[in-house]
Amino acid sequence: MSTEIGNNTQFQATTPQEKVALEVSNFVTKNGGSLQFASAWLGNMEHESGLNPARIQSDLTFNSAWAFNPSTNGYALGLAMMDGERRVNLLNFAKEQKKDWQAVPVQLEYMWNHDGSDSALLKRMSKSSDVNQLAVDILVHWERAGTKNDPNEQIKRDRKSVV
């Protein structure tokens, strides 16, 4: 897997993570998003799943009873570690499409076009070129991370935004 970057130089993805990163980047730009957005979104995904689309929180095995129960939390899965109702909706989307939920294109299509108001939010954010602000916005508004209001995490983000 490769892509054209800049002035005719090519990037050859060799590791599984590089292949996922390139797939996400190509998806974002093909859908009108900026490379800065792709970078920020990838940073979030890397932190969440290590860019492993088959990852399940705490490296648990797949358990259908937990996975399809929207009340089950702490059983996030996929690139963005979707949990609760979002996890169930992703799984049902994949099932309706007769595709594997672990496939990167399935997860990207779901997040970009089928995740309700969160899809609209991604598309709006994807037009920005401020990678630092995007990293925070993705964390706070799209991911709705449990750490977003943690004072220590806020201090870290504030320090990074000053640098």
Predicted features, each with a name:
Residues 1-5:
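Non-Sec secretion/translocation targeting segments of pathogen effectors
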Residues 6-23, 46-128:
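Peptidoglycan-targeting cell-wall enzymes and recognition modules
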Residues 22, 26, 30, 39-42, ...:
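Solvent-exposed, polar/charged alpha-helical surfaces in well-ordered, non-transmembrane soluble domains
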Residues 30-36, 123-129:
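Surface-exposed acidic, glycine-flexible loop patches that form ligand/cofactor-binding
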Residues 33-39, 118, 132-133:
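Loop/turn elements at helix/coil->beta-strand transitions in domains of secreted/extracellular proteins
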Residues 45-49, 125-150:
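Acidic helix/loop microenvironments that form the catalytic cleft of cell-wall polysaccharide enzymes
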Residues 157-159:
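Short, low-complexity, polybasic intrinsically disordered segments
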Residues 162-163:
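Conserved small/polar residues in nucleotide/adenosyl-binding loops
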